[in-house]
Amino acid sequence: MAKQQIYQQRVLKLSSEYILWNKKDVHITLQEARDDQKLIPLFDSTAIRMIDIINEFHRDIACEEMDKLKQELKEIRRKPKSHENKKRISEIYKAMDDIQCKMDYVTVVFKSKEDFDELNKGFKVNGIEYHRLIGTPNGVKKSTIIYCAVKNKYDKFMYQELSRRLNNNRDETKELVPAKFEAHKALACSASTPVSTPNGILVVDDLIVHFKDKIIYLNDEDTDEPVMKEIDNADVELNICDGGGLMMPSLASRWSEEMHVNYLMGACCLRNSFCKGVVSTFDFQAFGREVAHCDTVTDVWGNVYNINNIELILTTSMLKLWDSYSSIEDYLNKCINNDFTFSITKVYPNELEEERNLNYQFIQSYNLSDEDIMHLISPTVSEIKDVLGGDYYKTLLFMKGSVDENYNGAEDDNVIKSLMIAPELLQDTYIINRIHNMINKKIDDAKIGTLKIKGNYCVVIGDPYALCQHIFSMGISDDKLGLLKAGEIYNKHWNDKQVNQVVCFRAPMSCHNNIRKMKIVNSDEMSYWYQYLPAVNILNCHDTLCMAENGMDTD
């Protein structure tokens, strides 16, 4: 399955006030919606793909039609203006809207709970009735809920059929927490790209490790204010693979090609029905041959498989409702029947950055001396001095690094392009003023802790070697699991730089205890088994790093 080059899709985004002002019976044309910024772009998702399937809407034909319409539009615009050409341009735009706009799917932004209660009774847009479909976790934070057409213009009972498919024929006798179930079901609305089905899937229990460590215990059960107590030798339980799974290099290679990635992906964020998490590339078949000396494994339902017939391993923390199905075959068959597919929301890079900007939270708890501060700000000050000194190449790098979504993106991009074409523009008054504005912003940001440092943001995964020891039931004691010891992490980027210690931060931070100094380690064994993971932090399963980083997990 090749990565789909889908055209831009759009949906209506209405406010609850607007719908209620129209007495829950809105009449609006697409052009009016566009003019009022009520027609918004929407990334492709499983839910949108299902809507197209239910409507018997063929995307390949639609893509060809869109290409033809765009080409015709270009050709007409080259011709002299005329009434006929103007009329045809309008017809082309209408035809493109019919393809792009998904009128079965409407998002509503709520002003109040009362509005929410009222609109959940139903409302109409252009004569079509809509019912509440789902609230995604991110959408709920922004008071936004997704509604679906009850019966659409194609006479399809969309709400009923889409709701049925999203439930994926799960065992409805299983008790669920409503809020969690809503979040699990909403995974179908994540922006994603479909990929091919793996050749063999294994679902296993999470790896739960127990050890003793020093902790700070907070208890607010019996008092108005929390009581803090330090415990030196506390019992700690850690899920080392919370939201994490494994894929064979063969599967990673195939998915990399399907996602048009020009390297072997080390990790990606995966979706399917009630399934979410990060899968990392690890040759668990080789592990079976060389370490476990075994090729049979047992899944969470008690079924036995040959590991050489498995390409993807999911954990129970990834497949949220695994116990609502009788086996992996039962789950996959129901996914096929309801048009669920595996899809990828993000492919992680194979190289990490050399430099990043600090967040003020990361340094606010430090008691820094003047000498420490001078050392910390040195890279930022040097960069500003280089630009003020007129260094052409460093000015270009500075400007590219200063461009983000909050700073005149398109205009600054044009300035950079102009400088690349004509370096002498560095002496132009307008360019000089523009650079000075950027420098002033850089200085203001530096004052609140946005400082350039050697570092990067990096995804974390639990030790896949330890997970495989668990999968193959090797009987290894908790304190011997994995290749990493307490206080250690593996990171190829820092190993290649011969760095032996890093400081780990994760926003948002609440106290200095959220900061951890970790050893960067390596060995021939680690280099071999972690060879497909060049740009991730591999965590040990013997310390409280995840707890210290505000409950960090691996998905």
Where are these regions (language model features)?
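Conserved small-residue
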Residues: 1-552
